[in-house]
Amino acid sequence: MRPLFFAAISCGLLSSWLVSQQPIAAVLLGLWLFRVWCLRERHTLMVTLVCVVGFAGWFSWQNHRFEHLAALPSQSMQAELTVQPDAISIRGGQYQLVANGSVGRVLVRGQLKSAHDKQWLQRVTRRMVWHAQGTLAPIDPPTNPGQFDAPMYYRSQGIAQQLTLTQVFQIQAAPRTGWLGIVDRLHQWRWAFAQRCQQLPPMLARYASSLLVGLRPADFQTTMGAIQQLGLLHLFSLSGMHVILLISFLKWGLIRLHLSRQATDYWLLGLLPAYLIFGGGADSLQRAVITAALPIVWELVTHRTSGALSGWSLALMIGLIHNPLVLSQLGGQLSYGLALLLILMPSMPSWKLAVWIQVISLPVLLVATAQWHALSLAVNLIVAPLFSWLLFPVTMIGAIFGTQVPGIASSCEWLLVNFQTWLDWVSHWPGLLVLGQPNAIWAWGLSLLSLWLLRTPTRRYRRLLVLAYGCFILSMRFPLHGAVQFIDVGQGDSILIRQPFNRQVSLIDTGGRLHFPKPHWQDDGLTPKARVETITVNYLHRLGITHLDTVYLSHKDVDHIGDLGELLRLMPVKRVVVPAGMAHLDKFQKLLQPAKQPPIVMEALAGQTFADGLMAVHPFRPGRAENEDSLVLTGVFGQRRFMFTGDLDRAGERAITARYPQLRVDVLKLGHHGSKTASDPEALQQLGVRQGILSVGRHNRYGHPNQETLTTLANLRIETYSTALQGMITYRFFNHRQGQWQTFLKEGNRYQRTASVKNDSQR
């Protein structure tokens, strides 16, 4: 079935080009089609071209559909929604559903009004129909590089819009008719199993829900971070290994019932699709089920065995029809890529196979996580067989019998806790390497070079691969350009300054969120991750940056320094610079406690200069780190002078212009998020500001930026950028040459359209 293989690879490259928007994939597709043409096999060429044309039409239609839905304005509407019990998730006082309705498949969010409502929703056991009203809008896109891309994630599930409920009129049980009754039962059993897992000891519950039904608890990442750090996450994603173990278990049981081989095959064909639904239907599980089921079907129909390669090819094409983004996600890349690798590789010892899997998968892992643990190979060699023969069976036994026999549950819990403790211990060993995130060209190049080395394992190609990785790491660690980047951290400030070759890397403020008291019933014991972890540190790692030389803190407000403790816990910082009078505040000292390596703390007054080219121009005397005491910094980057003002008020701005009458500023980080208490017109005019940056949160409760400030900027003809409308704002420069402005969100994005409609309605 060689034609299917060539067609499947062509369709995979086509999806990377048309759906994932990777131009290099178009070049590779052209080369691959030329290779097919050179085979001089008319049948293979025709099958490949027909598939390419068909899939091109499918991908183009999908792109048009989702782009159309993403461009629609928000609208209030009433909806009838059908919701399965296992599609409901509750977090604190909020709930989230995946529902089907008149608007198609949609993500639904809402607020719980009472503890009674929360308890009732937790007890829903069957498919329900919701009659509700809410606001339908496109799913919010990420606003910083490397941030979780919700639209792409939900698009892979066929979802393009979110419905925020404002009122629920009625919830009633949906009728069970036809084949939907069987599907409903499977979803109900999945939900019941997940609820049963919650009665088990904590570690056994986490393993059972993630390994058997594909549901990861909300605390999975925080309590089992070592699994991701050591590259073991693929073991906890339902995929080929789990399906093979399940088939072995089912065959063992069916043979014990004295069923014939043909009857066993028919039972498997019925049970595998059922498990696909029961296991959550993830792309990796779908591939494994299709790959396992196709040879059975082929043998029953033709009485001949089929090749594994044809099964893999059909599974990929079916997967691309179901989810055109399957090869753009880590799970799909590892599932399909490693499965193909196991099919094509010659027979070799298990340790050698593990080495090759690490080599081939490294570029994919770097794109997803930007880091790699040097011990991951050794740990995988130990854990993979242990997982198949001990951990998975123990989890299954504990999940099935643990609630009836407490002794079994406690024994399984003891084993899993000790295993997890060992993993946590190993993960803290030296060896975690932050290498950076390769772009599409680097990722494809490293992957293809690794595959070529597998095909021709010579010393020359080994050296070439090592050289390529060396060049990649050097390009990440020592970039030719520098940048001033205003990170979108919501209603707060955080500015990253990188000198060319990363000679100095500094951060001005960390951002932070205020936490308001909430009713006891809304407290689920989980603390949301700080933005400095999900946005700032994540982005630094993708740049290959492992430490910060200096962190400047403008003053003591939470939206400027609230995430300092998390930053110090996650990343080494050499020094922290604060305005004079702030270093001894209890609030600041508490934020220093999580640091693994305590930084040097320095207090600054106007006139002090620093190694990264910044100079302080405020405060003039020690204060209490209030808004009026803000540390104000200025420096020249790429032939433009920047000034960063924290939350300094108008009086402070005028004081700076009086103290430094010759000071001229090209780019001003506008004070206090655009509040009318800052941005004095006379001060801005004297400074000669040409561009202003608003670091402000969307829909913030303070009404920032104030209309008075916007009028001042318009009157002075100051070009304005806003993190609320354009996401991360970057000024990229090369040494002393003038740089260029870039915004993460392009002109005409959803946030700008929404703001434009709001302004029009207020006029």
Task: Give the label of every model feature segment.
Residues 1-70, 181, 287, 441, ...:
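N-terminal leader/targeting segments
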Residues 30, 41-42, 163, 223-379, ...:
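Hydrophobic alpha-helical transmembrane segments in multi-pass membrane proteins
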Residues 55-234, 534-538, 547, 581-583, ...:
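Membrane-interface helix/helix-cap signal primarily in integral membrane proteins
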Residues 81, 331, 361, 576, ...:
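Residue-level signal for inorganic ion chemistry
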Residues 120-121, 126, 130-135, 146, ...:
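Non-globular, low-confidence helical/coil segments that flank catalytic cores
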Residues 158-291, 296, 550-552, 641-644, ...:
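Aromatic-rich juxtamembrane segments at the membrane interface
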Residues 342-435, 691:
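Alpha-helical transmembrane segments of multi-pass integral membrane proteins
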